[in-house]
Amino acid sequence: SLRMVLKYFNKTVSKKDIVRKIGGLKRYGVRVIDLADFAKKLGFDVYCYSNNKKLSKGKADIRKPNKPDILKFLKNGLPVIVAVRTYVIFNEGLSNEGHIIVIVGHKNKEFIFNDPFDGKQKNINEDKLIKALKENSLDSSAYLLVIKPNIK
């Protein structure tokens, strides 16, 4: 997911390098908070939201998932990385399984997202996406990550 967004900003980093720099894969993949730290080290401005004070370790703004936050970033041309509950999005997987996707647009009450799993672009009803975010937000170090080139 981060690799997709870095590529959007013309920054190429291999999947292997990202995994190595964030300390390897955890039991359930990567933590959004670790991706945020890595993006900061690359010189990006980072917006990171969490709904779990303990897991975020003080590295994210604590707030509940909501549609206006996502739309604000999209309006400014920034892709939005989100951690969602897998079974809500895809109607499959374990009830406690999370997945990270990249939201790239919004049209006709649907969000458009890129799925790092298969690289395909997909659409999802906005209410379903917010439900998937809310159901995963308490189990995630962070549920939303936006990076922006630091222009000085």
Regions found by a protein language model. Give the residues of each.
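Cysteine-nucleophile protease catalytic domains, especially the papain-like/related folds used
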Residues: 1-68, 76, 143, 147-151
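Short linear motifs in intrinsically disordered
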Residues: 26-28, 101-105
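Noncatalytic regulatory segments and standalone regulatory/sensor domains
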Residues: 48, 75, 85, 90-95, ...
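Charged helix-capping and loop-helix junction motifs
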Residues: 64-66, 95-99
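Active-site-adjacent structural elements in enzyme catalytic domains
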Residues: 68-69, 107
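Short, surface-exposed beta-edge/turn micro-motifs
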Residues: 77-79, 98-100
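Structural motif
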Residues: 81-83
